[in-house]
């Protein structure tokens, strides 16, 4: 199974990235959710503007689909500067990064997505650029090689990652601001779905937006994807208006249940409950039971189920929680 093939995958396709640009908030005043991040960034941005300085370098981390790129765009808009965007895998050579840095205007924002995937060679170039606004470049090769320093304008580096633990300490320590994005609460997702529906010209009730939000796994990207599929259903099967009933019908048809679980989530939980009496069950046995690779279970299926309290990892194996039994309307066995 490929994670990107799942309707409830938090990853984005190229088409979705293009479509989402039109409905992204542009300013902090439009930004919904993440109240602590929003209030802190408002102060940091205002302070930098009052001083006439570039904003401190900013690291944004958290699960995929929560709006790290959106926040980077908002920072650039609020600061009134240009945003240059790239990603860790794209910056293969030191010269690739040097070319971007030397083209920055004062106070510009350089956004590096997947910054944990920077090569060590590129990372070494980044250290003096972040700390001293200087670029060290080697000219020539062998014994005749020499280093020259190029002054850079003050700029803000925004790094985004889903794996903050994979960053090296020297890189992580050079960020003056670190923000973690959390999964969104349902009321905030409802607001986001309603806003997206208005941008898309859809007629949608508050209850319809709530139904989509409940099944979006705390993730705006998933919420917007589900909204597009609900729109398709409403236009073909009804008059295009989206109520709670129509949203529920559409999402049930798409095999996304009230908890945001898809077929594979339910298959895993039911395997633990039905085939292994609720567990504990070893990872290899579970992988064989559902016909998936153990890496797929560990990296794709398990994290959300564990976060939401439906599955437990124990030293003896995986166990279904009481909440998982109740989700399927099955009475859990009495604990000894």
Curated annotation (Swiss-Prot):
The alphabetized UniProt keywords are: ATP-binding, Cytoplasm, DNA damage, DNA recombination, DNA repair, DNA-binding, Hydrolase, Nucleotide-binding
- Residue segments, region Head domain (RuvB-H): 258-336
Biological processes annotated in GO = DNA recombination; DNA repair
Q: Where does Mg(2+) bind?
A: 69
Please give the catalytic activity noted in the UniProt record. ATP + H2O = ADP + phosphate + H(+)
Give this protein's Gene Ontology molecular function annotations. Answer: ATP binding; ATP hydrolysis activity; four-way junction DNA binding; four-way junction helicase activity
Q: Which residues bind DNA?
A: 294, 313, 318
- Among the Pfam families in the record, one is AAA_lid_4
InterPro entries, per database record: AAA+_ATPase (IPR003593), AAA_lid_4 (IPR041445), DNA_helicase_Holl-junc_RuvB (IPR004605), P-loop_NTPase (IPR027417), RuvB-like_N (IPR008824), RuvB_C (IPR008823), WH-like_DNA-bd_sf (IPR036388), WH_DNA-bd_sf (IPR036390)
Q: What are the GO cellular component annotations?
A: cytoplasm; Holliday junction resolvase complex
Task: Give the span(s) annotated as Large ATPase domain (RuvB-L).
Answer: 4-184
Q: What is its EC number?
A: 3.6.4.-
Q: What class of enzyme is it?
A: hydrolase
Record localization? Cytoplasm
Region Small ATPAse domain (RuvB-S): list its residue ranges. 185-255
* Domains (record comment): Has 3 domains, the large (RuvB-L) and small ATPase (RuvB-S) domains and the C-terminal head (RuvB-H) domain. The head domain binds DNA, while the ATPase domains jointly bind ATP, ADP or are empty depending on the state of the subunit in the translocation cycle. During a single DNA translocation step the structure of each domain remains the same, but their relative positions change.
User: Tell me, what does this protein do in biology?
Assistant: The RuvA-RuvB-RuvC complex processes Holliday junction (HJ) DNA during genetic recombination and DNA repair, while the RuvA-RuvB complex plays an important role in the rescue of blocked DNA replication forks via replication fork reversal (RFR). RuvA specifically binds to HJ cruciform DNA, conferring on it an open structure. The RuvB hexamer acts as an ATP-dependent pump, pulling dsDNA into and through the RuvAB complex. RuvB forms 2 homohexamers on either side of HJ DNA bound by 1 or 2 RuvA tetramers; 4 subunits per hexamer contact DNA at a time.
Q: How does it assemble?
A: Homohexamer. Forms an RuvA(8)-RuvB(12)-Holliday junction (HJ) complex. HJ DNA is sandwiched between 2 RuvA tetramers; dsDNA enters through RuvA and exits via RuvB. An RuvB hexamer assembles on each DNA strand where it exits the tetramer. Each RuvB hexamer is contacted by two RuvA subunits (via domain III) on 2 adjacent RuvB subunits; this complex drives branch migration. In the full resolvosome a probable DNA-RuvA(4)-RuvB(12)-RuvC(2) complex forms which resolves the HJ.
Q: What is the similarity comment for this entry?
A: Belongs to the RuvB family.
Q: What is this protein called?
A: Holliday junction branch migration complex subunit RuvB
To which species is this protein native? Answer: Salmonella arizonae (strain ATCC BAA-731 / CDC346-86 / RSK2980)
Query: Could you tell me the gene encoding this protein?
Result: ruvB
């Amino acid at each position: 199974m490929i994670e990107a093939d799942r309707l409830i995958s938090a990853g984005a396709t190229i088409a979705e990235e293009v479509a989402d640009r039109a409905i992204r908030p542009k300013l902090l005043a439009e930004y919904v959710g993440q109240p602590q991040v929003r209030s802190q960034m408002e102060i940091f941005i205002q302070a930098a503007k009052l001083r006439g300085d570039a904003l401190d370098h900013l690291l944004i981390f958290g699960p995929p689909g929560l709006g790290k790129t959106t926040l980077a765009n908002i920072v650039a808009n609020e600061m009134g500067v240009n945003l240059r965007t790239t990603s860790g895998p794209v910056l293969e050579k030191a010269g690739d990064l040097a070319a971007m840095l030397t083209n920055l205007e004062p106070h510009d924002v350089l956004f590096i997505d997947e910054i944990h995937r920077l090569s060590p060679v590129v990372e070494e170039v980044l250290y003096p650029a972040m700390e001293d606004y200087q670029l060290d470049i080697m000219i020539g090769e062998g014994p005749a090689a020499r280093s020259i320093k190029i002054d850079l304008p003050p700029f803000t580096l925004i790094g985004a990652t889903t794996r903050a633990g994979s960053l090296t300490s020297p890189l992580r320590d050079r960020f003056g601001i670190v923000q973690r994005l959390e999964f969104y609460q349902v009321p905030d997702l409802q607001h986001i779905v309603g806003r997206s529906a208005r941008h898309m010209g859809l007629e949608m009730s508050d209850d319809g937006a709530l139904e989509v939000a409940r099944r979006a796994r705390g993730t705006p990207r998933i919420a917007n994807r589900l909204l597009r599929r609900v729109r398709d259903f409403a236009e073909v099967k009804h008059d295009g208006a989206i109520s709670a009933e129509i949203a529920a019908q559409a999402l049930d048809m798409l095999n996304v249940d009230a908890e945001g679980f898809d077929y594979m989530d339910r298959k895993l939980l039911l395997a633990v409950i039905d085939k292994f009496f609720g567990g504990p069950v070893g990872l290899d046995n579970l992988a064989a039971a559902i016909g998936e690779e153990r890496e797929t279970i560990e990296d794709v299926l398990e994290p959300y189920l564990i976060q939401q309290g439906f599955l437990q990892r124990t030293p003896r194996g995986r166990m279904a929680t009481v909440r998982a039994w109740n989700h399927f309307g099955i009475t859990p066995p009495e604990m000894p």
